[in-house]
């Protein structure tokens, strides 16, 4: 049980910009840290849903901007870094070795900037179109996206340069993440009649498959790429599927 508690606070400290009440680290709890990602997602989702509610009291363009930026601000833009890195690498259309080298390059290329602009415009446009829609299901979209992230990192073949390449696959953390994903999807459907978490999971799966195919394995950057697109997909499904 202590490793699960360690894993939760480790995930909070690493993947949220909100100050963690207890800063701890245990190397043996790294797999539990990944399994606790969806619990951290519940915190991020709560902030996102609250911002969506507050945005209803603001002029629509400003409210849409708040909703679009909230999931990025609450994580300190961590997953956007992976999104931009993967876009740079994949859109270079070079051989596998070069794409992997570009992925690890700390410089920001033109492809990353262009994709980031398109992502921001897409997310802002989705929320600008959300007039008269209850956005509370947003609370569970980050839960679903992070449960998928945990499943992907703990089960898919890792990239040789990934920090998770030596980590043991499978086990209780995978079962826990799968159960949380199912709970998020079922809860959203029963409580709000929304399939936003399902849409987020589907987009994550497609994006992760594409990233792994293009870059030769799973990594934190590929997960961030898929997670970012998954949250856009979940929000779009919530707003556009009326």
Language model features with spans:
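Membrane-proximal soluble regions of multi-pass membrane proteins
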Residues: 1-25
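N-terminal beta-alpha supersecondary unit
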Residues: 7-13, 27-52, 56, 166-170
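C-terminal ends of transmembrane helices
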Residues: 19-25, 74, 78, 97-98, ...
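Multi-pass membrane catalytic core of lipid/isoprenoid biosynthesis enzymes
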Residues: 30-48, 89-133, 137-138, 175-188, ...
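Membrane-embedded alpha-helical segments that form the functional core of polytopic membrane enzymes
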Residues: 35-87, 137-140, 194-213
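Acidic (Asp/Glu-rich) catalytic motifs at the cytosolic membrane interface
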Residues: 70-108, 211-230
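Solvent-exposed interhelical
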Residues: 92, 147-181, 215-218
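Hydrophobic core of alpha-helical transmembrane segments in multi-pass integral membrane proteins
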Residues: 175-192, 198-208
